[in-house]
């Protein structure tokens, strides 16, 4: 049993880059998982105040996906959290670890949240689930992708995915663009408010929209006609596009940080090797 009472808030939820503890976890996870047959892998990990059980299973649709029970974590904060990960047969171990880190970031955030504003992203997640109805699900899925904790968790997948690969920065960027980390932003960018409004019967859309406004937008102004609906979803189309621009920059920043670190590490290695060579030459001169 882990005592959560005295957890130190190392970083705020607003910190978008991967925290140092998650970098360490990703490296240790890869080392451990590499020792075993990955499909069917199961193990429990404890890192400081984070405790989780990992189960890796074969996906039935040839893709990577994972899940955790966020509500259970909130209700029972002292439990070890179950992370179930589904992977394809032709998996990339780095992306497997990245998928796990996505969920670990959620756990980390729940245990280190220190403001109501930080909580809103998770609260909205709970509210939107009941609005997955018919074609309205298309909008709700985009809202889910746009939640702050989801954007951060996807961004935190970049370090474990490309950090240990022997690639240059451009090729790493191209690789990230081929994943859901980047494609999720393309989905947000593709939202067309007119097409969406026309895809749902007006009275049904009014009802669902006003529930969304009350529970998620927390706005007193309800939609009363089709013009209101068009304006409301036009604003969301603009909002999604602004998020896309913002988070594509975040992806670039995250990749650049990784390569700055690699350059620094390489320079340290070169300097260390040169120093050792000078010592060896000096010893040979003095003692021979």
Language-model region placement:
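Amphipathic, interaction-prone secondary-structure segments
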Residues: 38-65
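A conserved beta-strand element that flanks and buttresses the S-adenosyl-L-methionine
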Residues: 100
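Short acidic, low-complexity intrinsically disordered linear motifs used
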Residues: 2-16
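Active-site metal-coordination segments of metallo-dependent hydrolases
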Residues: 139-154
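Active-site catalytic microenvironments for nucleophilic, acid-base chemistry
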Residues: 107-115, 159-164
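Active-site scaffold of zinc-dependent metalloenzymes
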Residues: 57-95, 104-111
